[in-house]
UniProtKB/Swiss-Prot annotation:
InterPro entries: ARM-like, ARM-type_fold, Deoxyhypusine_hydroxylase, HEAT_type_2, PBS_lyase_HEAT. Keywords: Cytoplasm, Hypusine biosynthesis, Iron, Metal-binding, Monooxygenase, Nucleus, Oxidoreductase, Repeat. GO terms for biological process: filamentous growth of a population of unicellular organisms; filamentous growth of a population of unicellular organisms in response to neutral pH; microtubule cytoskeleton organization; single-species biofilm formation on inanimate substrate. Catalyzes the hydroxylation of the N(6)-(4-aminobutyl)-L-lysine intermediate to form hypusine, an essential post-translational modification only found in mature eIF-5A factor. Fe cation 1 binds at H72, E73, H105, E106. Pathway: Protein modification; eIF5A hypusination. Coiled coil: none annotated. This is Deoxyhypusine hydroxylase.
Length: 318
């Protein structure tokens, strides 16, 4: 039986691992993503810790792959497990200069999501020394997130209950009169003199407000010079699934001068939103010269088919 014939929803952990790492050499990328999400489900939710840790170990085996898109998703998933067992795998990726920038960035962000205090010296090192701005900025955010999570301030802040279950690079700004005003949040979002962590907090507060006005305020962030910042806005749009964001996402995806990490996130967001105008746009990028954009279009179209079929979720756990 080939990997693509295995029922991913009933597969054993070992079968899921073999699909994820493409043991046969001919497994569809979309199926590898589905296997990843199902392993994540076990790694983050299984009450049997030995089984959960086995799933995490199997997920981390994929860091030897060539696909930048898949490896960055692997790092993201490990950060969402809430299990420090994943931290050594992520530290190793951050330290490996042979890994692509997008993968190393996601590993650093995942260490922040795990709240891993033991990783602070490593994050400080790369915040100060890494030649890549995206890595330095990610480490800055991860450091701030870990400090915030372990602070008195975090205990006393009133955060509105979010619709989203993701562990984000920064918490939304605390709820008060000024953070309920979209215009004020837009100012913070776009103020390059403010700390990046505070700007991200405004970003996630706008996401949680979720109105069309909030979406358009977020879209203004696509004018920022930071690829990291812009890719996070595209990611947030993929979570929100509000069709009002489609024109700005299409514009970003079509801009070949834009960083691959931003364009790929725009493609995935369009796949999540999955309105009729998204389909031909995504199809036009199936042969893009940037591998991570091309792979994202493939996965996004697969997501599109799921969203427009009777399947309720892209995988067992999204």
């Amino acid at each position: 039986m080939s990997a693509d014939e295995v029922n991913i929803d009933t597969a054993s952990l070992e079968e899921l691992r073999d699909i994820l790492i493409n043991k046969t050499g001919n497994t569809k990328l979309a199926n590898r993503f589905r296997a990843l999400f199902n392993l994540k489900s076990v790694g983050s939710e299984d009450s049997d810790k030995e089984r959960a840790h086995k799933a995490i170990k199997y997920i981390a085996e994929c860091f030897n792959d060539d696909s930048e898109l898949l490896k960055h998703e692997v790092a993201y998933v490990l950060g969402q497990t809430k299990d420090l067992y994943a931290a050594p795998y992520l530290r190793e990726v951050l330290e490996n200069d042979n890994q692509q920038c997008m993968v190393r960035h996601e590993a650093a962000e995942a260490l922040g999501a795990l709240g891993d205090k033991e990783s602070l010296p490593l994050l400080e090192k790369y915040f100060k020394e890494d030649p890549l701005l995206e890595i330095r900025q990610t480490c800055e955010l991860a450091i701030e997130r870990i400090h915030w999570e372990n602070s008195e301030k975090a205990k006393n802040e009133v955060l509105e209950k979010s619709l989203y279950t993701s562990i984000d690079p920064a918490p939304p700004l605390a709820t008060n009169d000024s953070t309920s005003k979209v215009e004020k949040l837009k100012e913070i979002l776009n103020d390059q003199d403010k700390p990046l962590f505070e700007r991200y907090r405004a970003m996630f507060r706008l996401r949680d407000i979720g109105t069309d006005e909030a979406c358009l305020a977020l879209a203004s962030g696509f004018d920022d010079p930071s690829a990291l910042f812009k890719h996070e806005i595209a990611y947030v749009f993929g979570q929100m699934c509000n069709p009002v964001t489609v024109p700005s996402l299409i514009k970003v995806l079509k801009d070949e001068s834009e960083a691959g990490m931003v364009r790929h996130e725009a493609a995935e967001a369009l796949g999540s939103i999955a309105t009729d105008e998204c389909l031909p746009v995504l199809q036009s990028f199936l042969n893009d010269s940037e591998p991570v954009v091309r792979d994202s279009a493939i996965v996004a179209l697969d997501m599109y088919e799921y969203e427009n079929s009777n399947e309720l979720e892209y995988a067992t756990v999204k």
